[in-house]
Each structure stands twice: as structure tokens, then as C-alpha cells.
Amino acid sequence: LFLTGANIGFMPAGNYLGQVLGGQSSRWLLIPIGMLIGYFIVRAEPAVYVLNKQVEEVTDGAISAGTMGAALSAGVALSVGLAMVRVLTGISILWFLIPGYLFAISISFVVPKLYTAIAFDAGGVASGPMTATFLLPLAQGACIAVGGNIVTDAFGVVAMVAMTPLITVQLMGLVAQLKTRKARSAQPLLDTAALLAELPDDAIIEL
């Protein structure tokens, strides 16, 4: 049933939309429109919904489903935008994948391990059936419209979608870690200020 719906609905629609957008005089609009589509299409992934809920339950709400969804949406939007740049310019995918994975692996040494594990799971989940059945035909249709090479320029969208959540989710973890450290460093100052406020006016403090 899913394959029938994908072949009849998603794939032709994605291909047609890509050709329409690529056939416009302002071809650069492919980039922001592709990013917008990527931002919302990941919300339709059933596996993404399940992952977000599981992460929220396991972390007792420390990482909310909404925060996870926003990080994944931002990652997929970025990946689709970069894919449209490839379609328009013909840049090799290696110029994106190699630096991207190197950066993702590099920050994994400073990010809490929980976020690193979640990020790698999120990368696999985000590149699910909706990506393969809609975003890939979208890139193929756009590539046909701009006269590019489908084999070298259109393919690789799924790989990009699998990579960017590794970066966005880990960056989310890095921000959370920095906020935690800042809060801990400020706590002793707050405790001292509260203690001084409770002392009577004639109290003598020995140094």
C-alpha cells in the first residue's frame, strides 16, 4: 500500500514540483523553497515522531520532543538547501559530506555522549521513506529543469539528510552543556548573596 502511494503520489508530485521550480526564471528560489519543504517534511516521518517521544521519555523531559523536532527540522532544511545548491552549481557532494562528517565527529568529543548517540540515531531516522519518495524526486525534477546531470547532481539528497542531524542535534547538546556550566558557575554567587541578605545589619563578618 505504501509503495503504491509513493509511486502514484509522492514521487510524481515531487518530480513535477522540482521541474516547475527549476523552470522558473529565478532559479535561486529552489534553495529557500527546498529548505522550507525540508523543514516541514521531516515532521511527517512516523519514525521521527517515535524517536522524539522516546527521547523525551528517557530523559524525563530534559530533551523535549519539540526541541528534538526543531533540531531535526533545521538539519533537514539545511541539507535540502545544500542539495539545491548542488543542483544549481554542480558542486561535488564530497565537498559537503567530508567536511560535514569531520565536523560532526570532531564535536562529538566535547558534546555529552547522550546527545552524540541521539544524533546518530536521528540521522538514520530523518532519512526515512518521506525523504526517499519526495525529496529525491524533487531534486531530480529540478536537475532536469536546469539541465544538470541527474546522476552526479540530483542523487545524494538522502546522504545529506542523514548527515545534518548529526551536526544540529550535537550543537543543541553543546548549547545545553554551556548553559548548564554557566548556571553552575553562577549558583555559588547567588548562594552567597542570599546568605548576606539574611544576615542582620549589625552582624560582623570575619574574613
Predicted feature descriptions by range:
Residues F2-G9, G81-L82, A132-N149:
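Hydrophobic alpha-helical transmembrane segments in multi-pass integral membrane proteins
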Residues G5, L82-I105, I118-S127, V151-V158:
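Transmembrane helix-loop boundary segments of multi-pass membrane transporters
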Residues K53-G61, S108-G123, T180:
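Alpha-helical transmembrane segments
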Residues W28-S108:
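Helix-loop-helix junctions within the multi-pass membrane cores of secondary transporters/permeases
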Residues F155, A159-R184:
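Membrane-helix cytosolic exit motif
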Residues Q54-A62, L174-L207:
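Intrinsically disordered, low-complexity non-transmembrane regions of multi-pass membrane transporters
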Residues S25, A145-M163:
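Structural signal for the N-terminal portions of transmembrane helices
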Residues F2-Y16, V42-A47:
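Transmembrane alpha-helix boundary signature
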